[in-house]
Amino acid sequence: VNTRHNIGFKILDYIANQEGISFQTVKLGEVAELKIKGRTILLLKPNTYMNLSGKAVKYWLEKENIEKENMLVITDDLNLSFGTIRIKTKGSDGGHNGLKNIQLLLNSTEYPRFRFGISDAFKKGQQVNYVLGEWDTEEKEKLKERLEISSKIIKSFALAGLNNTMNEFNGK
């Protein structure tokens, strides 16, 4: 679980720990409810294979009657240096199979995503090992600060909206 590919889970676990809430095992994943300023934020960690996470995303959007514009998908991104954050309104899957599956099942590329840079500091042919590998010492030292910013992003998205969140946090 402590791998670069699981940064989304790590961010959600950080928020849950910070807020004193816990995840419950439910259909297709684990869910925690964060109540903040009169709003309820549903945190979802799909338990499908990452490359099939669209199944859980689609199920929970439909079950909770959430518009795709009101969800924020967190994804690792090899094309961004470690810890770099990009929040986007829409886009391609960027070669990420989890996003590819979400887009297939939602029949759309138009949903907000939060891209967390994990860098591409691996040797040729070592991408899978790198992505599924644990954080190195230097990354671990910087991770807590990046998790704190990530937590603020999730809360800002829910309370201030996508555009305000993008303006405040993109590039930080």
Predicted regions: what they are:
Residues 1-89, 100-114, 121-126, 133, ...:
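Nucleotide and nucleotide-moiety/phosphate-recognizing core
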Residues 95-98:
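Hydrophobic alpha-helical segments within soluble ligand-binding/sensing domains
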Residues 92:
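Short glycine/threonine-rich catalytic loop with a Thr-x-Gly-x-Asp
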